[in-house]
Amino acid sequence: MKVKLFVSIIGLFVCTSVFAQTITIEEYVNRYKDIAISEMIRSGVPASITLAQGIVETENGNSKLVKKSNNHFGIKCKETWTGPSVSHDDDAPGECFRKYNTAEESYIDHSDFLRTRKHYAFLFQLDPTDYKSWAYGLKKAG
């Protein structure tokens, strides 16, 4: 009886440990760097900036929002979004966020989002290797 209880407790501990593991920054970068580089080539958004935003917005890929929506950048629905969405508590309860089938869809939409918004247009005049100017520019643009 004691052996069965011990084995059960060990099994529960192992299962809990496996499911409770979180993604590190390094793991996030390794997992998504190829998509970010591809998007940099396609759109001009620096891969370092894209990855940094993804890390911050998703807590390295561990946030509830990214797990239920593949939304790596916290992009909300707004009035023009007609695709799938999820409800998530953010600045206000039950806000509408875009939902993606894959992380790659989220990365592509992020690049397109920046390229098509007038208040981000000045960023594309910057050197794509100048991550500091891009970071300050994104902060300035809001």
What are these regions (language model features)?
Residues 18-142:
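Catalytic cores of secreted/periplasmic lytic hydrolases that degrade extracellular macromolecules
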